[in-house]
UniProtKB/Swiss-Prot annotation:
The keyword Cytoplasm applies. It is found in: Cytoplasm. This is Glutamate-1-semialdehyde 2,1-aminomutase. Keywords: Cytoplasm, Isomerase, Porphyrin biosynthesis, Pyridoxal phosphate. PANTHER family: GLUTAMATE-1-SEMIALDEHYDE 2,1-AMINOMUTASE, GLUTAMATE-1-SEMIALDEHYDE 2,1-AMINOMUTASE 1, CHLOROPLASTIC-RELATED. Homodimer. Belongs to the class-III pyridoxal-phosphate-dependent aminotransferase family. HemL subfamily. Pfam families: Aminotran_3. The modification N6-(pyridoxal phosphate)lysine is found at K270.
Length: 429
């Protein structure tokens, strides 16, 4: 029995499903989860000593690669002065100033510890600011596991939940909790316009993944985002971009800088923690002024602005500002996507791939999908076989057909070539 299997058997005795986040259990692809012992650069090693080229990157944060010496040093130096204070630090100000500088739509920002906290708090603030209750979200977009957002959500819920019904995607969420959440089709402008026409003056906020990375990778159309911005402005609703995944991953200024659309609020995470638990929400000063202790919208957190997370995140944010960083990252990610498409074409396998910044999506279907409905038509059985063939050849992809992949600054040409060599074998199998 492998060491990975031994650990999985042991974990299931004390941890539900043997994992602390569902997709890690390999339920959708089958087989034994890999228990990771260490990682460096673009590589990870499991409990059996197997090395993998890593395309999960901790689900996005490791944009400069695992265990970057500057990030490690910053955390070690900070840890020597204690791990947490429960009081303000100067480093929190440095982090806030850096975020506001890099994302101009954010005039003020509040640090939290997870993406779920960021989106949950942003929606509460939007409701408090507008005095309205109704929220619009979109099919396949995942905004964390707050109750009101678990309706036709993406990420692991595409594997575990019934997504055919306009009802909570998780047991334990009362239907009454989600009655103020309206779910519309991603990239459907007409449906969005109709919703605003029917609910004029009732909509508190629209929240959207500008590049949806939790139903694989689906880009918002320019027309969709433009209409969203115009409708929110006209009706006084708050436009929230969930950039927990895309922030500093798609571009230095996030997906909003790539598209040239300015939201009222932005949620960030992943990269801003450099691998540590950290997230943030921020936006217009007049909206943020409603947040406690200035206003009546309450939000708090014992570990918000944690010194270790801030040290890792701030160092990462400074590293990614190096000249040419995003040009190279984008080029390498595109090279990977194009190489995978060519390998599939040569093997006669229906397949498509897309890439934006340091994110990529692979789809076992003809053509890149533009909506939740199109994503669900992918050949998941074929993906599962491909996933295991790649794993056997030392390439670690997301263990789900509905998750985006991530490239780091450490994925050089030799690593991409090794990946494509493995893919050619996998497609031919």
């Amino acid at each position: 029995m492998s060491r990975n299997q031994q650990l999985f058997d042991r974990a299931q005795q004390t941890i539900p499903g043997g994992v602390n986040s569902p997709v890690r259990a390999f339920r959708s692809v089958g087989g034994t989860p890999r228990f990771i012992t260490c990682a460096e650069g673009a590589y990870m090693w499991d409990a059996d000593g197997q090395r993998y080229i890593d395309y999960i990157g901790s689900w996005g944060p490791m944009i400069v690669g695992h265990a970057h010496p500057d990030v490690v040093r910053a955390v070690q130096e900070t840890a020597a002065h204690s791990f947490s204070f429960g009081a303000p630090t100067e480093a929190e100000i440095d982090m806030a100033e850096e975020i506001c500088k890099l994302v101009p739509s954010i005039e003020q920002v509040r640090l939290v510890s997870s993406g779920t906290e960021a989106t949950m708090s942003a929606l509460r603030l939007a409701r408090g600011f507008t005095g309205r209750d109704l929220i619009i979200k979109f099919e396949g977009c995942y905004h964390g596991h707050a109750d009101s957002l678990l309706v036709k959500a993406g990420s692991g819920l595409l594997t575990f939940a019934d997504t055919t019904q306009n009802a909570p995607s998780s047991a334990g969420v009362p239907a009454d909790v989600t009655r103020h959440t309206m779910v519309l089709e991603y990239n459907n402008v007409a449906q969005l316009e109709e919703a605003f026409a029917q609910h004029r003056g009732e909509i508190a906020a629209v929240i959207v993944e500008v590049v949806a990375g939790n139903m694989n990778l689906v880009r918002a159309s320019d027309a969709f985002l433009k209409a969203m911005r115009e409708l929110c402005t006209r009706d006084g609703a708050v436009l929230i971009f969930d950039e927990v995944m895309t922030g500093f991953r798609v571009a230095l200024g996030g997906a909003q800088s790539h598209y040239g659309i300015t939201p009222d609020m932005t949620c960030l995470g992943k990269v801003i923690g450099g691998g540590m638990p950290a997230a943030a929400f921020g936006g217009r000063r007049d909206i943020m002024a409603k947040l406690a202790p200035l206003g009546g919208v309450y939000q708090a957190g014992t570990l918000s602005g944690n010194p270790l997370a801030v040290a890792a995140g701030l160092t990462t944010l400074r590293l990614i500002q190096a000249p040419g960083f995003y040009d190279k990252l984008t080029a390498q990610t595109r090279k990977l996507a194009d190489g995978l498409s060519e390998a599939a074409r040569a093997a006669g396998v229906p397949f498509a791939a897309d890439a934006i910044g340091g994110m990529f999506g692979i789809y076992f279907r003809d053509g890149v999908p533009g909506s939740f409905a199109e994503v669900t038509k992918s050949d998941t059985a074929r993906f599962n076989r491909f996933f295991h063939a790649m794993l056997d050849n030392g390439v670690y992809l997301a263990p789900s057909a509905f998750e985006a992949g991530f490239v780091s600054a450490c994925h050089d040409d030799a690593i991409l070539q090794a990946t494509l060599d493995a893919a050619r074998k996998a497609f031919a199998a």
